């Protein structure tokens, strides 16, 4: 009688990231038909008992693909679920259980530890690309918000970390303050930059005195101005012959409707930055006006060595 062909061992496909039974005799993955597979050692418990893992245990391992997870990113109160980083290579997903079924992690700690040991022994140091996974907490009471609802509320700024006692204890990405203080979405960073730039709108020289603004002379535009292509520095419109414009002490000309609103907010010429008093606001801020930095002359004049000797009679 011919001997039966040996049963293929347990293999792990690195392309599919799942445990498979290879297709013989080529030893390829039956799902992706790739040869990038690796034979897995027998389980310790199976070696001690002298039997292969049962079908029910294998089915249970396939139904619990999220045993091997790292420390949670951050935790929420009991019943809210928690985030964790898994070592799988697919996109973010939330595992669910069939109707009427429950995860037995809380009721059977021994079984959960066996699955964790089985997962560590099965994958070892082989850790494909990390992905963000989530596990639902069991035993959620009626009326407790779901994990999706909590995330949506955090994003919308409806609730703050003060209402969630255990929020913000993870190693990365911790919310330490109001969620509205963070940059959310694709336009969040642009909104923060715009807010920072708007803080500089009211900086600069103080408004000019109304008496000085009203005292600015009005001069007509001459042919020399028109021939040189002179234009208003504010609106960039060319001056017309005989048009009346306002002249600043720095001799720059402006339309009355262009320069008056500017001077009501900033006491400086838009071209040369000189104030109506002739001070250069770009190099000498108004707050430092009248402060003298010439200390060398005063120190030299007060030095005893520089005193003229008294003439002897």
Curated annotation (Swiss-Prot):
SUPFAM superfamilies cross-referenced by the UniProt entry: RING/U-box (SSF57850)
Biased segments, Low complexity type: 292-313
Pathway(s) where this gene product acts: Protein modification; protein ubiquitination
First-tier enzyme category under EC: transferase
Biased composition (Basic residues): 118-128
PTM summary: Ubiquitinated. May undergo autoubiquitination.
Region: Disordered, residue numbers: 42-64, 96-128, 280-313
Biased amino acid composition, Basic and acidic residues: 104-117
Region entry Sufficient for interaction with AICDA, spans: 203-306
Zinc finger (C4-type): 13-32
Gene Ontology annotations of biological process type: cytoplasm protein quality control by the ubiquitin-proteasome system; negative regulation of epidermal growth factor receptor signaling pathway; positive regulation of double-strand break repair via homologous recombination; proteasome-mediated ubiquitin-dependent protein catabolic process; protein K27-linked ubiquitination; protein K29-linked ubiquitination; protein K48-linked ubiquitination; protein K63-linked ubiquitination
Record EC number: 2.3.2.27
Zn finger (RING-type) location: 232-273
Annotated coiled-coil segments of the chain: none
Domain of life: Eukaryota
GO cellular component entries: cytoplasm; cytosol; nucleus
Entry keywords, A to Z: Acetylation, Cytoplasm, Metal-binding, Nucleus, Phosphoprotein, Transferase, Ubl conjugation, Ubl conjugation pathway, Zinc, Zinc-finger
Keyword Nucleus: yes
Domain free text: The C4-type zinc finger is required for interaction with BAG6.
Entry function: E3 ubiquitin-protein ligase that mediates ubiquitination oF target proteins. Depending on the associated E2 ligase, mediates 'Lys-27'-, 'Lys-29'-, 'Lys-48'- and/or 'Lys-63'-linked polyubiquitination of substrates. Part of a BAG6-dependent quality control process ensuring that proteins of the secretory pathway that are mislocalized to the cytosol are degraded by the proteasome. Probably acts by providing the ubiquitin ligase activity associated with the BAG6 complex and be responsible for ubiquitination of the hydrophobic mislocalized proteins and their targeting to the proteasome.
Subunit (UniProt): Interacts with CCDC50, EGFR, FLT3 and SCAMP3. Interacts with BAG6 (via ubiquitin-like domain); required for BAG6-dependent ubiquitination of proteins mislocalized to the cytosol. Interacts with CDKN1A. Interacts with AICDA.
Name of the protein described by the UniProt record: E3 ubiquitin-protein ligase RNF126
Organism annotation: Bos taurus (Bovine)
């Amino acid at each position: 009688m011919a001997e039966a062909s040996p049963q293929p061992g347990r293999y792990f496909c690195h392309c599919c990231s799942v445990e498979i039974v290879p297709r013989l005799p080529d030893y390829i993955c039956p799902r992706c038909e790739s040869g990038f597979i690796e034979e897995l050692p027998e389980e310790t418990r199976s070696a001690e008992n002298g039997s292969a893992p049962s079908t029910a245990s294998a089915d249970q391992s396939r139904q619990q693909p999220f045993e091997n997870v790292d420390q949670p990113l951050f935790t929420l109160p009991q019943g809210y679920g928690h985030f964790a980083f898994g070592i799988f290579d697919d996109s973010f997903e939330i595992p669910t259980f069939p109707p009427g079924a429950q995860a037995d992690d809380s009721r059977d700690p021994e079984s959960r530890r066996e699955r964790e040991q089985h997962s560590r022994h099965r994958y070892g140091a082989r850790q494909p690309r990390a992905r963000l996974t989530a596990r639902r907490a069991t035993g959620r009471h009626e009326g407790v918000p779901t994990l999706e609802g909590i995330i949506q509320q955090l994003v919308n700024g409806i609730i703050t970390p003060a209402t969630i006692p255990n929020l913000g204890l993870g190693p990365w990405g911790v919310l330490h303050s109001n969620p509205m203080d963070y940059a959310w979405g694709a336009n969040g960073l642009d909104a923060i930059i715009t807010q920072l730039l708007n803080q500089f709108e009211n900086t600069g020289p103080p408004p000019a005195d109304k008496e000085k603004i009203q005292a600015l002379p009005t001069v007509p535009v001459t042919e020399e101005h028109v021939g040189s292509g002179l234009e208003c520095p504010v609106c960039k419109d060319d001056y017309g012959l005989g048009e009346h414009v306002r002249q600043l002490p720095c001799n720059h000309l402006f339309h009355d409707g262009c320069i008056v609103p500017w001077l009501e907010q900033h006491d400086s010429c838009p071209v040369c930055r000189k104030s109506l008093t002739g001070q250069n606001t770009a190099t000498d801020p108004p707050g430092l006006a009248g402060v003298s930095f010439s200390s060398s002359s005063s120190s030299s004049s007060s030095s005893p060595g520089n005193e003229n000797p008294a003439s002897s009679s």
